[in-house]
Amino acid sequence: CPFGSECLSEAAREQARNADLVVTNHAMLAIDALNGGRVLPEHDTVIIDEAHELVNRFTRAASKDLSPAIVTTTAKRAMTWLDDDVGADLLNQADSMDHALEATVPGRVTTPDAQVIQTCAVLRDLARVAVSQLGRNDEDSREPVDAERVQAQAAMREVFETAERMVRLAAADVVWVSESEKGYRSIHVAPLSVGGLLRENVFAQSTTILTSATLCIGGNFLAIARDVGLSPLEQIEGDAPEILETQMGWRGVDVGSPFDYSKQGILYVGRSLPRPGRDGIAPEVLDDLAELVWAAGGRTLGLFSSQRNAIAAAEHMRSAMPDIPVLCQGEGHLADLTRRFAADPRTCLFGTVSLWQGVDIPGDTCRLVVIDRIPFPRPDDPLMAARSKAVEDAGGNGFMTVSAGHAALLLAQGAGRLIRRADDRGVVAVLDPRLVTARYGNFLRASMPPFWTTTDREMAVGALRRLGE
C-alpha cells in the first residue's frame, strides 16, 4: 500500500499475521479466496460457522452490479484527472445505459447483441481509457500520492472489469437485469457456481471444518457437499481409506442436538388448506392462522414468503384480535421490532426472509412459529433458474437439487426459531399442504427438526392452549 504505516488495512494485516487465531467473517474469507489468498495470513485450519450461508456469501462476494447511478458517480469522482471528452463520454454513457435498461425486459440476458450488452461494451472501452488516464505519470511524479486519485482509479477499474465480465457472457456466469421496488433498473453478473472457487481456493489450501445446525439437508450431507464443490464419491465413511491425489476426501458428522424435539415441539401441517397460489394468502389460511395465534395467546413469530402476505396477515390479525399486538416487518427497524417482540409475550412479529435466520427468542415469548408456504425460490429468479437448468443439462433433477434444496434449508432455519433452549415448548405450523401431499414433502420434512407431526389443527390448538394454562 502506498500509504505504508498510515494504512489501517495494512496495520490490521500485520496484526493478523502475528496472531495465532484470526476471527473473521464469510465475506472476508470470500474476498481472500477471490484474490488468491493474499488478504488473510497463512493458516493451517479454517473453521467456518453458520456454513449453510457459505454458498450465498461467496456468491454475493463474486457478484457485480452496474447501473446508471454507479457509472455517473464513478465518472464524477474521476473527472478532475480525465480529459474533458472522456469524462463527458462516460456521463453520456450513463444515460445510454439508462435507456438500454429501460428497453430491456427484466430477466436473464444471454445474447451478445442485446442492447444492454452493447452498451456495456462501449462503457468497458471508455472505462479502460479512463483507468489509463487516472494512472498516467505516476511513475515519474515526485508529488505525494493523491489518495483521492488512487481511489477514483480503483473505482473506475471496478467499472471496467465488471463491464468486461458482462460483455463476455461466459458460460460460468449469469447476467441479468433487475428492477427495484422503486422502478430503478440495473444489470448484474454472478457465478453460476462457487463450488470450484471454494474447492480450489479454500479446501485445497488448508484443513476446513464446516459447522451449522442445518447442514444435513434431506437427511444427509450430500446437498451441501455438492454446493461447495465436493463430490459424493469423495465422502469418507468409517475408517479412512486411501484418497487419490486428485480427490478431496470429506466426512459428514451429525453430532446430534441437546434438544428433544419430538417431546418439545409439534409440527402441524395444514393438509386441508388450499395450495398456495399467486393471488396472495388465502382466507382459509388466515382463519387457521388466527385460531392458532388465539390459542397461543400471541407469542407468535410469523415467517412469510412475501411482504404482501405478511402485511395481509398482520391486517387480518389486528382486525380479528385487536387485543393482541401485531408487529410487521417494514413498520420500523427490524432490531427494534424484535426487541419489542421479545419484551411482550402477547406480541406477534410477522416478517419475511430477514426473520428466517438469526432471530433468537428463547422462552415463553415464542411458542408458535407460523410458515405460510414452502419457501421455494421465485420461478423468475435468474440465478436460481440458471443453476437449475445447469443441473438439468448435466442429467440431474434441477427442481430437487436447486429449488427443493433452497426450500429445505430455509424450512430448517425457520423451524429452528422455535426451540432455543432445553425448556422451550411450542408448535411450528406450516400452512401449506404440499409439505405432506407432494412427492418432495418427505425430503423437506427430513431437513427440519424431528418434531412430532400432525395434520390435525385441533390437536395443535389444544397443545398451544395447554401451554398457556
Question: What do these predicted ranges mean?
Answer:
Residues C1-E469:
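ASCE RecA-like P-loop NTPase motor cores
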